[in-house]
């Protein structure tokens, strides 16, 4: 026996709803999580460079030729050490490369690198906002497809 047309329409609406929900959860939310994770890593890198800038600025202010410090060898195992010349510093350029720079050169590099990282984080923020807008649009489409009414937005107090 054939199913009535109204029943088939409900089945196709239900199938569309399931496909849209699967697209939202499998694609859009996964993409959003990847973008947000990448942005968090960029923020961590930016934080490290800003900490390095603070250290370099303190070194320039104190004008000491020697520096006594503790170095973490890993697993929170520290050793005391003495840096005989604080006029030059090794900076991680990326991809495993390090370069010996003067403090002024290191500050220039940090400024450039931090501006690039800030631009990248801004771009990733825009990407995440676009994905969130797509998710919202898909949810609105689902609401219309299911015939649900918009619920009033809670007013901020």
UniProtKB/Swiss-Prot annotation:
This is Protein UXT. It is found in: Cytoplasm; Nucleus; Cytoplasm, Cytoskeleton, Microtubule organizing center, Centrosome; Cytoplasm, Cytoskeleton, Spindle pole. Homohexamer. Component of the PAQosome complex which is responsible for the biogenesis of several protein complexes and which consists of R2TP complex members RUVBL1, RUVBL2, RPAP3 and PIH1D1, URI complex members PFDN2, PFDN6, PDRG1, UXT and URI1 as well as ASDURF, POLR2E and DNAAF10/WDR92. Interacts with LRPPRC. Interacts with androgen receptor AR (via N-terminus). Interacts with estrogen receptor ESR1; the interaction relocalizes ESR1 to the cytoplasm. It holds the Pfam family Prefoldin. It comes from Rattus norvegicus (Rat). GO terms for biological process: centrosome cycle; microtubule cytoskeleton organization; negative regulation of transcription by RNA polymerase II. GO terms for molecular function: beta-tubulin binding; chromatin binding; transcription corepressor activity. Belongs to the UXT family. Coiled coil: none annotated. Involved in gene transcription regulation. Acts in concert with the corepressor URI1 to regulate androgen receptor AR-mediated transcription. Together with URI1, associates with chromatin to the NKX3-1 promoter region. Negatively regulates the transcriptional activity of the estrogen receptor ESR1 by inducing its translocation into the cytoplasm. May act as nuclear chaperone that facilitates the formation of the NF-kappa-B enhanceosome and thus positively regulates NF-kappa-B transcription activity. Transmembrane segments: none annotated. GO terms for cellular component: centrosome; chromatin; cytoplasm; cytoskeleton; mediator complex; nucleus; RPAP3/R2TP/prefoldin-like complex; spindle pole. Keywords: Activator, Chaperone, Cytoplasm, Cytoskeleton, Nucleus, Repressor, Transcription, Transcription regulation.
